[in-house]
Amino acid sequence: HIMNKLTIIDTGCANLSSVKFAFDHLGYRAEITRDIHKIQSANKLLLPGVGTAMAAMRNLQERNLIDCIRNATQPMLGICLGMQLMTEFSTEGNVATLGLMNGQTDLIPNSGLPLPHMGWNKVRYTPGHPLFAGIEQDSHFYFVHSYAIQPNESTIATSCYGMDFSAAIANKNFYGVQFHPERSGKNGA
């Protein structure tokens, strides 16, 4: 099943094995790699991420993966920090990110709610987007983050935590979700 082959880009974060396990469990054959040729020949790409934007960008740079990611033509999904890396800039360490779509990542403004934003929250998406096919409007997904991307023209879904923020973004073949699909049960699948 070539369709079910998933290539996870090794961003050097700690939780890669749990992401791989979750996708294996969904019936994908997931492989974690930092090999440029494997990434280029991949069927579907996953850009995971936990930790800081600065550390992740440094890891990608050291592995010469930045151009490889920017030039990818196959569908790529960024999760959590992986989604944040897809925009132009992160104020977390003031680091230029991959620039795959507009927007920047900022600390969630203090509205008296605890950070990180952690737990289940409702997601409202733009109707008709294939990423949310078969998912009910205002479904709940699992979030853990302190930084967020303000809604902009790349936003295809929002959630609210003291303010509206982008729960999902998309541009061409690049997709990002702020929530953790691998921890969101049936809707995450």
Where is each model-derived feature located?
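Extreme N-terminal starter segment of soluble prokaryotic enzymes
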Residues: M3-T7, N173
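N-terminal beta1-alpha1 ligand-phosphate binding loop
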Residues: L6-Y28, E182-R183
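Short acidic low-complexity segments
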Residues: A30-S41
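Structural alpha-helical scaffold elements that stabilize or flank donor/cofactor-binding regions
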Residues: K38-I39, C68, A168
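Short acidic/histidine-rich motifs immediately flanking catalytic phosphotransfer sites
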Residues: I39-G49
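Cysteine-nucleophile active-site neighborhood
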Residues: G51-W120
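Amide-donor transfer/coupling interface in amidating biosynthetic enzymes
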Residues: N71, Q104-A189
